[in-house]
Amino acid sequence: MKYSDLRDFIAQLESRELLKRIDYPVSPHLEMTVVSDKVLRSGGPALLFTNTPNYNMPVLTNLFGTVERVALGMGEESIVALREIGKLLAALKEPDPPKGFKDAFSKLPLLKQALNMAPKYVSGAECQTHVWEKDEVDLTLLPIQTCWPGDVAPLITWGLVTTRGPHQSRENMGIYRQQLLSKNKLIMRWLSHRGGALDYQAWQQEYPQERFPVAVTLGADPATILAAVTPVPDTLSEYAFAGLLRGQRTRLTRCIGNDLHVPASAEIVLEGYLEPGNEAPEGPYGDHTGYYNEVQSFPVFTVERITHRDKPIYHSTYTGRPPDEPAILGVALNEVFIPLLQKQFPEIVDFYLPPEGCSYRLAVVTIKKQYPGHAKRIMMAVWSFLRQFMYTKFVIVCDDDVDARNWQDVIWAMTTRMDPSRDTVMVENTPIDYLDFASPVSGLGSKMGMDATSKWPGETQREWGKPITMDEDVLNRVNSYWSLLGLK
């Protein structure tokens, strides 16, 4: 599905009956979470709350509440096509050397298409139609959700944060939640390994006394949002990748108060800065783990300016015990990850991040095993190849006769092909999600790999069991007279 901006995407979803307008008054304080959660768990549509009490702005939720809508946001019609996007990323990340002139010529369209999707810079952008500055800046006028009863304050959840480190031309995009502190202040919660945090660390080293410019986009088009959470190779900007997904170049405009760029069609943009040394305790908040997270200090984001379109739409979500919107997004992105992994490790048959494992804390991998110890190599590969799997605590490796997405298959393999002592790998003192309160130290914990493959000589001294299967000719013979047995 091709679209130009968020509003065009909303209109097309509505025409397909994949978006529902809610005209009944629903409060962003807790009530929207209940409605959105019930609809998401039933596989229902995206929601546009048009009557938000005490606010003059509609709220969009559940935009990516089904895998189908994630695929549509990536310009595709089905989840199957997301594998092709993964293959595109794999080709751009590590292109194969051409096998000859004909092969080199066939690769030119892909390269040309990527180069032609460089962002287009414009002035007079829609997102700057209205400007709030100085005393006009008031974040409390935005219908920011309070998602759970124990949340300390309203929380921006779909903020697309743009930063740039010193001496860098490429801008970084990331999704970081932001706690409302006051009319012009938010807390920027980003983990130390994320792009925005790394830019800020580099800035503080280079300019220890100077303010760090930041821009936050609320209500970008889906392709730009999805590009920010996809493992785009360093050779391609997120904006160029968004253009590839959308089928047209991303239109960017320069912020009014700094030299960062934001999507021209964005609904709302927050411009401001981080002051070195200015931090505040963030949380607690209900999170995607299904628990409230502990309180930690993060930088304070001072908002100097708010710009927006005519009649802006506020884009929001909630996070909680799966399934939630990030979990659905994780299921879709799982399909994008597979070709990236297979490019580097062709023996991988399937890779699955179960949503009930918070979409990243547990991975099941099936492989065509080729030698003793092969499963352990794959464990290390998962933990190290893509930064998205840095926090994956458990990796289960099975043979390719096992369905990675069927727990009955996986549990059967674990209980029949594993010896707990021989086939379990423990790695201590590794990076762990700060939200993982089960780890003994915040941000540092252990990982477990489980080898549920059949064992080869060198891995066992015993004769290995042969799986039970029925003869094919017997199956065919019984199937031929099955309808005569009076059985369903």
UniProtKB/Swiss-Prot annotation:
Binding site for prenylated FMN: I175, Y176, R177, R189, W190, L191, R194, G195
Keywords: Cell membrane, Decarboxylase, Flavoprotein, FMN, Lyase, Manganese, Membrane, Metal-binding, Ubiquinone biosynthesis
The keyword Lipid metabolism appears for this protein: no
Essential cofactor(s): prenylated FMN; Mn(2+)
Functional summary from the UniProt entry: Catalyzes the decarboxylation of 3-octaprenyl-4-hydroxy benzoate to 2-octaprenylphenol, an intermediate step in ubiquinone biosynthesis.
Residue ranges that the Swiss-Prot or TrEMBL entry lists as coiled coil: none
GO MF: 3-octaprenyl-4-hydroxybenzoate carboxy-lyase activity; metal ion binding
EC number: 4.1.1.98
Family: Belongs to the UbiD family.
GO process annotations (BP): ubiquinone biosynthetic process
Keyword Flavoprotein carried by entry: yes
Cofactor note: Binds 1 prenylated FMN per subunit.
InterPro entries attached to this UniProt entry: UbiD (IPR002830), UbiD-like_C (IPR049381), UbiD-like_N (IPR049383), UbiD_bacteria (IPR023677), UbiD_Rift_dom (IPR048304)
Subcellular location: Cell membrane
Principal subcellular localisation of the protein: membrane
HAMAP family per the UniProt record, alphabetical: UbiD (MF_01636)
Protein's UniProt name: 3-octaprenyl-4-hydroxybenzoate carboxy-lyase
Pathway: Cofactor biosynthesis; ubiquinone biosynthesis
Pfam family, one: UbiD_C
Membrane-spanning ranges: none
Record's signal peptide: none
Cellular component, GO, one term: plasma membrane
